């Protein structure tokens, strides 16, 4: 017999750093999900990833208090900041550029993010990522 789905919860958790403290603990606790069980499973699943990278996770929880979760790739902004060695984006994107990024780096980001983007091909994914780069104040070169 199939489990009754009680709902879904979307969180962004640093890789390998899930703890029962806020915001994770309260979000899971009010839905009756075992917090420590999730933290251990999440940390085990993300141990191969870069520590501290924000990982979007979709938690599906059931009426019997069990859960499953699926991991996504980190946000495009994380990859762009990492590739351009930035702390944050521009306060005035389009007017003030805080750095540059090459099309080769955008291509590598697009390949990494392809499974989470709703693009049909790599060129469309690259255009999406270029738009994100411009909105962060990065100049696309090459």
From Swiss-Prot:
Disulfide bonds: none annotated. InterPro entries: Ribosomal_uL11 (IPR000911), Ribosomal_uL11_bac-typ (IPR006519), Ribosomal_uL11_C (IPR020783), Ribosomal_uL11_C_sf (IPR036769), Ribosomal_uL11_CS (IPR020785), Ribosomal_uL11_N (IPR020784), Ribosomal_uL11_N_sf (IPR036796). One of its GO terms (biological process) is translation. The keyword rRNA-binding applies. Belongs to the universal ribosomal protein uL11 family. Forms part of the ribosomal stalk which helps the ribosome interact with GTP-bound translation factors. This is Large ribosomal subunit protein uL11. It comes from Bartonella bacilliformis (strain ATCC 35685 / KC583 / Herrer 020/F12,63).
């Amino acid at each position: 017999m199939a489990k009754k789905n009680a709902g879904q919860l979307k969180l962004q958790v640093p890789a390998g750093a899930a703890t029962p403290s806020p915001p994770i603990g309260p979000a899971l606790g009010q839905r009756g999900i075992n917090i420590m069980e999730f933290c251990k499973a999440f940390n085990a699943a993300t141990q191969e990833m870069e520590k501290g990278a924000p990982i979007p996770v979709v938690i599906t929880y059931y009426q019997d208090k069990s859960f499953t979760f699926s991991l996504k790739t980190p946000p495009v902004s994380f990859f762009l900041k990492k590739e351009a060695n930035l702390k944050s984006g521009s306060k005035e994107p389009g007017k003030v550029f805080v750095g540059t990024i090459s099309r080769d780096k955008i291509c590598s980001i697009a390949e990494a993010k392809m499974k989470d983007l709703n693009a049909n091909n790599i060129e469309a994914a690259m255009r999406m990522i270029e738009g994100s780069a411009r909105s962060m104040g990065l100049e696309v070169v090459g």
